[in-house]
Regions:
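Short, acidic, small-residue-rich periplasmic hinge/interaction motif at the N-terminus
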Residues: 16-20, 28-34, 62-67, 76, ...
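Short acidic/polar hinge/loop motifs at secondary-structure boundaries
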Residues: 49-51, 171-198
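A beta-strand signature from Gram-negative outer-membrane beta-barrel systems
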Residues: 185-230
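Gram-negative outer-membrane beta-barrel transporters
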Residues: 230, 541-542, 656-659, 678-807
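Membrane-embedded beta-barrel scaffold of Gram-negative outer-membrane proteins
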Residues: 359-363, 367-373, 586, 592-596, ...
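Structural signature of Gram-negative outer-membrane beta-barrels, strongest in the C-terminal barrel
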Residues: 503-515, 519, 523-659
Length: 892
């Protein structure tokens, strides 16, 4: 739209979005004359003013994500023109604007790596409880136990330490110290778009971006105030349990401009009973942004982001038994009550004439956390009664204990030669008879209750307190919270400078982060992280984009560890250099080929290195020798836009290769409670008991050696316009990954040579594959809109899990069970047969139907896991059953 006031030498006006009528700040307005190109940019209110030489000129209005508009004008001396311009968003998906790749705005078609993009409308339709509900529908992205993995880069780490960095407006939401992702901190009520970058991103963003990057961009206020309210309620179906667990949430957000201020505030409350017993999540979060655009200096703004979260939740580690998969094992029940707060001051200055931008960011972070654990709620009487124990058997037990040489030794001694030869079936059969004699109805879950009860009642009684101990033993166990609160503090500074040239962009910057953790989980530890980075992007012949970058990083934990270390001319330097490079070439109209190479690394978090805690009976054990993992990612990709009548979209195919050194993985098994040694032999087992150190069940982070992951990522997105009122949007993706343990042959040979009765293996089979990965994944999202109605579906199929921990499952064929088989049966029930029957791949489908009741109010009903499939990506963790959701939202 153009309006003419009169003619003259000055041209001015306002620039708005053609649909929303919101002012567009930062629009490039320019024209060419004999002296070159002259131009300006619009301010926060969309206002521009430009001096134009006499005569004819063509004004060009250019803004990323919008169609470029050219307007011819005729200028007479001594007069002026007013041009109010409305720009339309670019309907081409490949012209979408992203910022994650180069820390500045680029077209999706110009970037040199693979990226997926989700807009706010796509996210709201999913009615997510948090961002994980959205990410699981993206091709190449998996979420296991709330831990994201891009193209098989991560297995199962129980949420601690992440190879995928999560950002909100450029700042990390990984919890300092532990490296876990706090999904509850992400303001879902105010998300504008989510960018998922596939591949190493350590050059610009540092550690934890080894496998990829997920960047959440929040909305900014327009000219008119906007208030959004969203209410949702969910009802879990009944898989095989009593009761009907519920969840519900409320989102509120408000944004507006007040003179030179931008104000955004948001709040969320969420209560989830969980579909598994004692697996709940309760949160309250409030936050906001205040930005001041200084009228005295064009391009200068500064302000602050604030966020506070109260969270009370429990995790789910392992089940009670295959018959009770939605009930936690009494040995694995842990929760947290947390108060998390951060404040992020910032300052941005852009000089449009010089093409330079300065960005300063800071953060103060604090988390107070209390771990809540309990073993079993049952009393000793309850447990033994369930096991069929007869109180009249007590004298018999006492007699056996006092006269074990005559009562027990003759029964078990004959099996000693078999045991020495590695056969334990006869001995275990006799022990089974003895157990069945006293506990005729006992199950594996009952034995776990008994073990859990004993762990919760230690120390055992002596002759002076037997009576009091027995009275207390008849009482059920209760949840206990530690007296002390764990505290984690973080201080962060980030500076970025960018210079835009005619055909290139230079970005340089530096970061500093200080973390201090005072915790019962890890003890007291501090870390320092200092880095500087540089990236240069250049466009050649209007078709070729080339990008190169480097990062230097220093990291230290306490005073004794330098995780980032490099040899230069034989000398060790406490700095880790990381390089990346990429190119994108436009073959033809909407046809692009790209190639990229990026190094990455990730130093272990304080928690991974020093963790020592009980997960309600199951422990987590430290590994002070844990080293930083490093690797690189290479990719060759092709993107092609297409248009056939009313159908338009693009197809993207990429081949990728990732290699790791000193890869950090989660090892589950038995450990010495004091030395933290991994128990992989009878001698270590006996030493743990004879020394009084004790034995623990749990996990430890360890470096597993070399690994490589390669495959193909194929996806397509598009829209078919049936008519003015009807359209179908779709996204389809297939990913093939081949996750290889490069040291598998030597490791298998070493493990095969160990004939100890307690010999442990690294994983559940002798295959070449890494643990907790799948080879094939197919995902699809479809949404049909007709007038004010919409109907949509998500579909996902994944092939079987290739390998898991040996301590959980042994898939090898044996002539007879070994000692570990009997131990697994007692701990986890008949998990072997359950896993063999159910680990065959799975298909999950969600459905949704919605309607716009009025212009500002919409209602939507959803059914997740429509077919009520029971599925698992890892043993003893069953996915949610069929879930019914109602969502009501309003904008005004």
């Amino acid at each position: 739209m153009i309006t003419h006031a009169s003619f003259g030498q000055d041209v001015k006006g306002y620039i708005k979005d053609a649909e929303s009528k919101e002012a567009l700040a930062g629009v490039n307005v320019f024209y060419k004359d004999k002296g070159g190109t002259r131009g300006t940019v619009s301010d926060i209110n969309g206002y521009y003013e430009l001096k134009v030489t006499d005569g004819d000129a063509v004004l060009t209005f250019s803004y990323l994500g919008y169609e470029t508009l050219s307007v011819p004008v005729k200028v007479d001396p001594g007069e002026f023109l007013t041009h109010d311009v409305s720009l339309r968003t670019n309907s081409n998906m490949m012209d979408e604007v992203v910022v994650s790749v180069g820390r500045y705005e680029q077209k999706l078609s110009d970037i040199t790596v693979s990226m997926e993009l989700l807009k706010a409308k796509d996210i709201t339709r999913q009615s997510p409880k948090d961002l994980t509900d959205v990410l699981k529908n993206i091709s190449g992205v998996d979420v296991t136990d709330r831990q994201p993995s891009v193209r098989g880069g991560t297995g199962w780490t129980y949420g601690v330490g992440s190879r995928c960095l999560i950002l909100v407006d450029g700042m990390s939401v990984l919890t300092p110290g532990s490296g876990e992702i706090n999904w509850n901190m992400i303001p879902m009520e105010n998300v504008d778009q989510v960018e998922v970058l596939k591949g190493a991103s350590s050059v610009l963003y540092g550690s934890s971006a080894l496998n990829g990057l997920i960047h959440v961009k929040t909305k900014r206020p327009g000219l008119d105030p906007v208030t959004q309210v969203n209410v949702q309620g969910g009802l879990y179906g009944k898989p095989r349990q009593d009761g009907t667990p519920l969840y519900g949430g409320l989102d509120l957000s408000h944004s507006r401009r007040i003179k030179n201020f931008d104000l955004t505030v948001g709040a969320n409350t969420f209560l989830d009973d969980g579909y598994r017993q004692d697996n709940y999540n309760r949160r309250v979060r409030v936050g906001g942004n205040l930005t001041y655009h200084d009228p005295r200096v064009q391009g200068l703004n500064y302000g602050v982001n604030v966020n506070y979260l109260y969270n009370d939740y429990t995790g789910f580690f392992i089940w009670r038994s295959p018959e009770e998969p939605y009930i936690q094992s009494p040995l694995a029940n842990m929760g947290r009550r947390e108060n998390t707060f951060y404040i992020d001051p910032f300052l941005n200055y852009t000089n449009s004439e010089k093409g330079t931008t300065h960005r300063f960011k800071g953060r103060f972070f604090h988390r107070g956390s209390r771990i809540i654990t309990h073993t079993t709620d049952k009393s000793l009487f309850d447990i033994t009664n369930n096991m069929g124990f007869d109180i009249s058997s007590v004298p018999e037990i006492i007699n056996m204990a006092q006269n074990w040489q005559t009562e027990l030794l003759p029964t078990f001694l004959p099996y000693l030669p078999e045991v020495m030869n590695g056969k334990v079936s006869g001995l275990m059969a006799e022990l089974g008879k003895l157990g069945n004699h006293f506990f005729p109805t006992a199950t594996s879950a009952d034995y776990m209750d008994l073990i859990s009860w004993v762990m919760g009642r230690t120390p055992l009684p002596d002759k002076n307190n037997v009576g009091a101990w027995l009275v207390d033993a008849m009482k059920p166990m209760e949840k206990k919270a530690p007296e002390a609160t764990d505290h984690t503090y973080s201080y962060n500074l980030d500076y970025q400078f960018s210079k835009k040239f005619e055909h290139s962009q230079l970005t340089v910057g530096g970061t500093y982060e200080r973390i201090h953790a005072d915790s019962k989980v890890t003890g007291q530890h501090s870390s320092d992280n200092v880095a500087t980075f540089l990236q240069y992007d250049h466009k050649f012949i209007d078709r070729l984009n080339v990008s190169v970058g480097v990062r230097l990083e220093y990291y230290r934990v306490d005073d004794f560890y330098r995780e980032a270390e490099t040899k230069i001319f034989g000398a060790k330097v406490p700095v880790k250099p990381v390089f990346r490079g990429g190119l994108n070439y436009e073959l033809g109209e909407y046809s692009f080929i790209r190639a990229s190479f990026g190094q990455g690394y990730r130093y272990p978090s304080v928690t991974e290195k020093f963790i020592l805690k009980d997960i309600g009976g199951v422990g987590a054990f430290p590994n002070a020798e844990l080293k930083a993992e490093q690797g690189y990612n290479a990719e060759l990709g092709f993107k092609q836009g297409y248009k056939f009548g009313n159908l338009k979209g693009f197809i993207d195919v990429a081949g990728f290769y990732t290699r790791y050194k000193d890869m950090i993985e989660f090892r589950f098994g038995l450990f010495n409670n004091k030395t933290f040694d991994y128990i992989d032999g009878l001698s270590k087992l006996f030493n743990a008991f004879s020394s009084g150190d004790g034995l623990g069940i749990g996990a430890q982070f360890t470096n597993v050696g070399r690994a490589e992951i390669y495959g193909v990522d194929l996806s397509t997105s598009g829209v078919y316009e049936f008519n003015r009122d009807t359209r179908l949007a779709y996204t389809l993706g297939y990913v093939y990954t081949n996750p290889i343990d490069m040291d598998v042959d030597s490791r298998n040979a070493e493990e095969e040579a160990n004939d100890d009765l307690m010999a442990m293996r690294s994983k559940s089979n002798d295959s070449k594959y890494l643990k907790y990965r799948q080879k094939h994944s197919v995902k699809g999202v479809f949404d049909l809109e007709w007038k004010q109605f919409n109907i949509g579906t998500n579909m996902s199929w994944k092939s079987k899990t290739l390998a898991v921990d040996y301590f959980m499952v042994d898939e090898r064929t044996k002539a007879e069970p070994n000692l570990m088989d009997y131990m697994r049966s007692m701990l986890f029930g008949n998990l072997h047969d359950y896993w063999a029957e159910n680990n065959k791949g799975y298909f999950v489908m969600d459905m949704r139907v919605g309607m716009k009741v009025t212009k500002n109010v919409h209602v939507q009903g959803l059914v997740n896991n429509l077919l009520n499939k029971r599925y698992s990506a890892r043993p003893m963790d069953v996915g949610a059953p069929r879930t019914f959701i109602l969502q009501v939202g309003a904008n005004f």
